[in-house]
Design a protein with these regions (language model features):
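Mixed-charge (Asp/Glu-Lys/Arg
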Residues: 1-38, 43-151
Length: 151
């Protein structure tokens, strides 16, 4: 049975809230951006306002999918500025009482991975990534965002 769109949206919203909570517990002020804000979900920065960054959240519900889906158009991320990040959130299975897992990277690095994907140069728009396909140093790499904000 196909998953209704509103349930999929709840999964994405849960991912955004998890990321906001992780940033908050690290003392990083942040806010959810409006739903129609293009390519980003959260704004985070320093209290003095000297550094800000934008974060795109990609959530995956393991009871419904085993991969994160990116698109051919996300290859353009390879040219994004250093203040843009992606956080992949593996929501964890409620059936197994699992917690979330996170992979954090600069958006530029994610764009490069999209270009290196086997579907690059084909008519296939999908760029599917399983958690095992991500570079190991992306997992729980919250320091990537912290380092940027502390520059």
């Amino acid at each position: 049975m196909k998953t209704p769109q509103w349930i999929k949206k709840l999964g994405g919203h849960a991912g955004e809230l998890y990321v906001a909570a992780e940033l908050s517990k690290r003392g990083i002020p942040n806010a959810l951006l409006p739903e129609n804000f293009s390519d980003d979900d959260l704004l985070a920065g320093t209290k003095d306002g000297k550094r800000i960054c934008f974060i795109q959240v990609k959530a995956c519900h393991p009871d419904r999918s085993s991969t994160f889906i990116l698109r051919e158009t996300d290859e353009k991320w390879a040219d994004t500025p250093e203040n843009q990040f992606v956080v992949f959130v593996w929501l964890g299975s409620p059936k197994k009482n699992e917690g979330p897992r996170y992979w954090v990277a600069q958006k530029k690095a994610v764009g490069i991975e999209c270009v290196k994907h086997s579907a690059h140069g084909t008519h296939n728009w999908e760029r599917r990534f399983s958690p095992k396909a991500f570079p190991e140093d992306w997992e729980n790499n919250w320091q990537e965002i912290v380092r940027y904000l502390e520059k």
